[in-house]
Structure formats: C-alpha cells, structure tokens
Amino acid sequence: MVAAMAFPAAATYPTHFQGGALHLGRTDHCLFGFYPQTISSVNSRRASVSIKCQSTEPKTNGNILDNASNLLTNFLSGGSLGSMPTAEGSVSDLFGKPLFLSLYDWFLEHGGIYKLAFGPKAFVVISDPIIARHVLRENAFSYDKGVLAEILEPIMGKGLIPADLDTWKLRRRAITPAFHKLYLEAMVKVFSDCSEKMILKSEKLIREKETSSGEDTIELDLEAEFSSLALDIIGLSVFNYDFGSVTKESPVIKAVYGTLFEAEHRSTFYFPYWNFPPARWIVPRQRKFQSDLKIINDCLDGLIQNAKETRQETDVEKLQERDYTNLKDASLLRFLVDMRGVDIDDRQLRDDLMTMLIAGHETTAAVLTWAVFLLSQNPEKIRKAQAEIDAVLGQGPPTYESMKKLEYIRLIVVEVLRLFPQPPLLIRRTLKPETLPGGHKGEKEGHKVPKGTDIFISVYNLHRSPYFWDNPHDFEPERFLRTKESNGIEGWAGFDPSRSPGALYPNEIIADFAFLPFGGGPRKCIGDQFALMESTVALAMLFQKFDVELRGTPESVELVSGATIHAKNGMWCKLKRRSK
C-alpha cells in the first residue's frame, strides 16, 4: 500500500524518547507523510510513549497564525461536523513532527474519532476499530480514495489504489483470480531464488573481508539490500523481468524513486502548478519527473507487448490449473494477457503494473527493514526464530509447504506491521452524507459528516491503542497467539485467532478491525498473502545464514515517513556467519 498526503512542507523535529518523554531536534518534512518526515527511532523494548487518556498539559494561548487558522476552520467547516471533538491544528503542532505522531497524541486526548481543524479545511481522524469497520467494510462503497487518488493518478493512472469505484470493480474482478494457490506456490521459489542471490552476495563480501583483513564481520545497509531484493521479486513475479538489482544498479529503480519523490513534492503545495503544461518543461524537477516516468513506461510497454505477442487466450479456470512449477512465464502479466473475456487495454495494464511495482516494492522493503531493527534489540527472539528455521528448513531453501510451518517468522512479520504499519494512514472521502458511529467511549448517536469529507483512518493509532492492545508499544510477536476478550467494549468482538480458521496471518477479521496490516473490506490489499509470504521467506533465509546486529544504537536510527516508514540513513547492520 502507498500512503496519501497533502499540504505544505515545513520544518519538523527528529524525536527521541528519554524516560517516556518526547524530545525534538530539526529536519524537513511534509505534513501528511509522503514527503520525508524524520524522527529518531523508538527502542520498542526499553521505552514507549507514556499512555494518557486525557491531556495533562495546560492549555496555552496560540500565536496569531494558530488562532487565525482555528477561527477560519470553525467558521468555514466546524459547524458541518457538529459536536465532534476538535483537535485544533496549530501550526506548531502540525509541522513540529510527523503527522501520525501528532494524531496519536490527539487520539489519547480526544478519543477514537475527532476533527482535525486546519485553516479552511477539517479532516475526520478515526482511531477506533468499530468506526474503521463501518467505513472500510460495512459502507465501503460510500467512500473513495479522495486526495490519495488525486496525487497518485499521474503515476498510477487508474490502477487499483487510486482508481474510482467503477474502474476498481472491473480491475479487481480481473486481477483477483491471478493470485491463486498454484501461482503463490510457484512464487515461493521466486522469493527463495532472489533471496539466495542476496545471501550469496553477502557471503562473498564476508570471504573478501576475511581474506583482506582476517575479520569475519561486514557492515551492510540492509534497507538498500532489501529494496533491491523487493524490486527483483516484483520484476520476476509480476512482469517476468529480471531487474538484477541485487547484483547491479538499475536505472528503473532510480526512476521509481524519482516518481515517488515527485508525488511527495506535490503533497507540499497548495497550488498545483504542475497541471499547467508549460511547467513540464520549464521546471527542472518536472522535466526529471517526465523523464523518470518515460523510463518506467517504456519498460512496462515493452513487457506488455512481448506478452501480447505470445498470447495464448484461455479461460480463467484453465489458467489457474496450469503447471506453474514448470511454466517458463508464471507472471501476473502473463495471466492477465492470456485471460479470455477480458478487454486487454494497454493503458489499463500499464496502470495495474505500475501500481503493483511501486506498492509491492515499497511495502516489502520497509517491513524487512524494521524486522531487522526490532529483532536486533531482542536477541532472545532471534534465537527463537533461528531455532524454528533450523527445525523446519535445516540448511535447505523454503518451499510453499515449509513456509507455512514457519509460524513464528510469520508472527514476527505481522508484529512488525503492527508497530510500523505500511502506510500509517488510510485515506477516504465521503461520496454522500454519512453518519459515523461514535465508537468506544464516543457519542451514542454518532456523528453526521457531509459529502466530500476527507477521512484519515490512522492505522498507527489502531495498532498502538491502549484500549485494544496490551503493552501496545512492545515488540511481542507471541501476542497474536492469545485470545483477547472485548472487555465490555460494546460493538467490538475482541481478538480471536479461531475466527478465521486456516488464515495465513492474523487479519482484520481475527482482530475485528483493530489490526489492519493490509487494510480491510472490499478494497483490502489484493496482494496481502503474496507480501506476507515474500517477507517470511526473505527473513527466514537471512537469519538461516547470518547473525545480525545494528551497527550503532537503536536511538541513532532516524525514521523517515514517506510512502512508507523507512530509515533516513539506511539500516546499517553487522553481518557474520551464524555461530551454531
């Protein structure tokens, strides 16, 4: 998934935690998360944000700019949201640190639904699973992606993430059959083969280090390695194209990051100057964006044409029964091109592929990065993970069946997604007047919201809510094995792993929407099982061969919130062969 964002860039302050208190330093960021926002990381095992149900800070008088912003909001949009609690978006609060951290503070003060007032605009922020379920599942087609679609459309076109409802229904119906069981089974070998290249590269570097200096430890930016790995996997599994970025530099990945950065930039301006055609050639960054987009589009267009030239049209059922273990081209592109009864439109295929390229690449690289970060601070959990790896895999590569037995590794992946959700916010906009439920401790009659209201579902808040999680800031993969009662919370069914028998991972059904690692409802991420399996295989193969620790302290790792949450200066780690 890719997060949405909007509004001006400003100064933010990298944060670190001392004794549960938040302290600040300075860098640059954009308000809503696409443009880099930097904070120093949290040592999840030793420190956490102190939980408060109401603000204990005395109210202070805002400056002139703050007060003007609040008055303007109340005049123009405050009345339309009735008595909903209001978090007044002072300039200092909104631009002083990444938005999702401010949203968490206001959630603890105002509850599971509140209005974020900012200038002439007001946003509804949801941090309650009861309300999230209402929006994402029970009334899913009363909302579209709003500002997310506006920003991503120049890049992803009518792909699944930014698509309007009518287009989304058509494309979802076409793409969903491609993620069938035999395809996923075949992809485990792709995950394994690509991960093996990363492993062999690291082993070669260790041998060279031993030869040159006698040392058996190397230092690697694992975030960069995971980024290359994720690109190679997406290339082979979606396009049947080998980027080879684990072993060489890829111009395509540079272009991908260039397009993402432009999306970040567009979130920082009130005035969309890029919509004026001359800006494409006058403004240097817009010229670069057009160049990056052309590189990616040329690559995708070539792949689409190659696939169509060898098209073997057949029914969906027969496509799903192909021998994917021996198929030369088992990619999603091949499936979509060969599917009978589907109008093959090059532009729509390009949009679908671009969406999968960017969303799939970003999410996996971020999950693996933060998995290493959290595990490196918990050596006992590394030992437990390696014991499972040894028992299930031995020295061999994962298969589909053995991957399913790596239960603890999968729990690590989902716990990483709980603490570092990708993205931290889901964006929706009402298509008609709606009445949102009040949620836990909220108004019984709920809240009326008008058509066109922008809604932020804070996945970060849901995943760290003290009302629905025990020790919400701690890294505890084992938590997903336990049942949690609703504890009298009306409208929430609690956490019960048996609610979704056979599920590959704890999902929104098991947690009744308190856990949304891949969203929920009809517009849930279509590649959830793919992403979980990919991360499980890569993580297992890394710790099968190596012992890993951070190069510096956890506090030295700075967090950047862009399309996903990643490390500002990479995730530098020390690797050496496992000592058994």
Swiss-Prot record:
In its UniProt record, which GO terms are filed under biological process? Answer: carotenoid biosynthetic process
Compartments annotated for it: namely:
Plastid, Chloroplast membrane
- Which cellular component, as a GO term, is one annotated location? chloroplast stroma
User: Does the entry annotate any disulfide bonds, and if so which pairs?
Assistant: none
> One GO molecular function term?
iron ion binding
Which amino acid positions bind heme, per UniProt? C525
- Group of enzyme by EC: oxidoreductase
Give EC number(s), comma-separated: 1.14.-.-
Query: Which key words tag this protein in UniProt?
Result: Carotenoid biosynthesis, Chloroplast, Heme, Iron, Membrane, Metal-binding, Monooxygenase, Oxidoreductase, Plastid, Transit peptide
> Where does the UniProt entry say this protein principally localizes?
plastid
State the superkingdom.
Answer: Eukaryota
**The organelle targeting sequence, given as a residue range:** 1-52
Q: Which family does it belong to?
A: Belongs to the cytochrome P450 family.
Name listed for the protein in its UniProt record: Cytochrome P450 97B3, chloroplastic
Recorded source organism is Arabidopsis thaliana
